[in-house]
């Protein structure tokens, strides 16, 4: 395992601990967080949730974009490695530059699409204001 993988894993562990702290805060503040009044403290918690709890889902979606594109174009031994706050896809195959471009771009394309869906959801879904802020914040991060 390379040094960069170890440092990425260490950061994921640290972020995971902050994520656990965020869950603890959310449980403690659930009644005020989910009421109809959005405070500055609620917004701080929204950003913590968006980054430390939802970002791993965005990373997974990003890597899945690479994975499915590689599978679609006939790569062999395609493997998705999700490490929480980072990940990578490995595969074997020889591709022309345009196919490689598509496989490489599939991850960011999925992330962008997910972000736009979150923004749209924040606008059109009939949900509480705090959940609108959460969707919009995650969409911004994507």
Please place each PLM-identified region on the residue numbering:
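Hydrophobic transmembrane alpha-helices and their immediate loop junctions
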Residues: 1-142
